[in-house]
Design a protein with these regions (language model features):
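Active-site-proximal loop/helix segments of hydrolase catalytic cores
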Residues: 99-104, 110-138
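Binuclear metal-ion centers of metallo-dependent hydrolases, dominated by the metallo-beta-lactamase
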Residues: 122-199
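Binuclear metal-dependent hydrolase catalytic cores
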Residues: 1-115, 181-199
Length: 199
C-alpha cells in the first residue's frame, strides 16, 4: 500500500474503512504511519466489531495512546453499526457472505459501491446496491470458489444490480488481464493498481 499511496501522491486521508481483517486487507495498516505523522493526527479507522478486535490486537501499537511509547498512535478505532457520514460522503455498510460462516462489509458511497471478498449477497445487500452507478466488485477467478465470487457469479450480480460501470477487483494470478478484459461485456472492466475512478 505504501508504494501505491506514494505513486498517487496521497497526503491526506479522511478515514479508512475495513471490509474485514484478513491479512490481504489489513496488513497495510502500518503504511498509514507516514500519513498520520504528515497530517499531525491519528487516522480514523472504521470496521465492524470483529474486525476492530482483530486489528487492535494484531496492531495494538498503532492504536495505543502512550506519550512515552516509541511508536505514537496512528489510528483511532470506530465501530460501524449503521450508515455514517465521512468527509462529506454518506457511507452505507452492508454485510456480505465470505464463506464458512465469515462475513465482510461492503460499502456504498452515494452512487458508487465497493464489494470485495464476497461469495454470496443477500437481499439486504442487493437493496443497498440498488441504483448504484459504479460498482467495484469481487471476481477472484473463472472457476467457483468457496469464499469469493467467480466470473460467472459476478456477471450475474452485475446483471441484477445494473450499474453503468462495474470494475472487477480481487482477481488472482490465474486471470490474465487482457483475456479477462476481452471476455467482459460492455460496462464491465477489470481493475488495476492505480486505477482512478471519478464519481
Amino acid at each position: 500500500m505504501r508504494e501505491q499511496l506514494l505513486d498517487a501522491g496521497v497526503k491526506h486521508i479522511d478515514a479508512v474503512l475495513y471490509t474485514h481483517a484478513h491479512a490481504d486487507h489489513s496488513h497495510g495498516l502500518n503504511d498509514l504511519r507516514s500519513l498520520a505523522y504528515h497530517m499531525g493526527r491519528p487516522i480514523d479507522i472504521y470496521g465492524n466489531q470483529a474486525t476492530l478486535d482483530d486489528l487492535t490486537t494484531s496492531f495494538a501499537y498503532a492504536f495505543r495512546q502512550d506519550e512515552h511509547a516509541v511508536y505514537k498512535r496512528i489510528a483511532v478505532a470506530h465501530q460501524i453499526d449503521g450508515p455514517l457520514r465521512l468527509g462529506g460522503i454518506d457511507v452505507v455498510p452492508f454485510e456480505q457472505e465470505h464463506g464458512f460462516g465469515a462475513t465482510t462489509l461492503g460499502f456504498r458511497f452515494g452512487a458508487m459501491a465497493y464489494s470485495t471478498d464476497a461469495v454470496e449477497l443477500d437481499e439486504a445487500a442487493f437493496a443497498a446496491l440498488a441504483g448504484v452507478d459504479v460498482w467495484i466488485v469481487d471476481c477472484l477467478r473463472y472457476e467457483p470458489h468457496p469464499t469469493h465470487a467467480h466470473f460467472e457469479r459476478t456477471l450475474a450480480w452485475i446483471a441484477r444490480v445494473k450499474p453503468r460501470r462495474a470494475v472487477l477487483t480481487h482477481m488472482n494470478q490465474a486471470l490474465d488481464y487482457e483475456e479477462l478484459r476481452r471476455r467482459c461485456p460492455p460496462g464491465v472492466e477489470p481493475g488495476y493498481d492505480g486505477l482512478v475512478i471519478e464519481v
